[in-house]
């Protein structure tokens, strides 16, 4: 597992990276994570999140535009454990998570706005691999996202940690 330090990436690639507005917190078991972006756009319905974490996620990060909702959790312990089992590097969720005491022990990166104990409805509503924008940054499927306890950033191409 590669370790990323976002301040070092910003210093090495200042003209390449976009940094998300500082509103995310680390809820996962990895201090840092990075990979190719897979996007979901949904609102208080995590049906597509459930579908995606059941697929192979090696080298990928699931970026979920949950509309910034603070009323439902888009990720909990069971889906996080599936994501870890299927090799996902992490998830960036513009929304809430739950089961935070278990998430912090799960081998997957999770950046989200807050915790909330209420689960979502599963109505099968949402869009997969569409361009999404939140926190002042646009996320395009196939680009790259990197996160640690300092913040989250996006790059159009893969980045190497400087020596």
UniProtKB/Swiss-Prot annotation:
Cross-referenced Pfam families, in alphabetical order? RraA-like
GO biological process terms, alphabetically, are: regulation of RNA metabolic process
The reply on keyword Lyase is: yes
Q: What keywords tag this UniProt record? A: Lyase, Metal-binding
Q: Report the EC number(s), separated by commas if there are several.
A: 4.1.3.17, 4.1.1.112
Q: Does Metal-binding appear among the keywords? A: yes
Note on how the cofactor is bound: Divalent metal cation.
Q: Which CDD domains match?
A: RraA_family (cd16841)
Residues holding a divalent metal cation: 99
- Which cofactor does the UniProt annotation name? a divalent metal cation
Catalytic activity field? 4-hydroxy-4-methyl-2-oxoglutarate = 2 pyruvate; oxaloacetate + H(+) = pyruvate + CO2
Gene Ontology molecular functions? 4-hydroxy-4-methyl-2-oxoglutarate aldolase activity; metal ion binding; oxaloacetate decarboxylase activity; ribonuclease inhibitor activity
Q: Which residues bind substrate?
A: 76-79, 98
- What InterPro entries does the entry give? RraA (IPR010203), RraA/RraA-like (IPR005493), RraA/RraA-like_sf (IPR036704)
Q: Which family does it belong to?
A: Belongs to the class II aldolase/RraA-like family.
Xref: NCBIfam families: NOT-MenG (TIGR01935), PRK09372.1 (NF006875), PRK12487.1 (NF009134)
- PANTHER family the UniProt entry points to: 4-HYDROXY-4-METHYL-2-OXOGLUTARATE ALDOLASE 3-RELATED, REGULATOR OF RIBONUCLEASE ACTIVITY A
The UniProt subunit note reads as follows: Homotrimer.
What this protein is reported to do is described as: Catalyzes the aldol cleavage of 4-hydroxy-4-methyl-2-oxoglutarate (HMG) into 2 molecules of pyruvate. Also contains a secondary oxaloacetate (OAA) decarboxylase activity due to the common pyruvate enolate transition state formed following C-C bond cleavage in the retro-aldol and decarboxylation reactions.
State the protein's name. Putative 4-hydroxy-4-methyl-2-oxoglutarate aldolase
The opening ranks of the lineage are: Bacteria, Pseudomonadati, Pseudomonadota, Gammaproteobacteria, Pseudomonadales
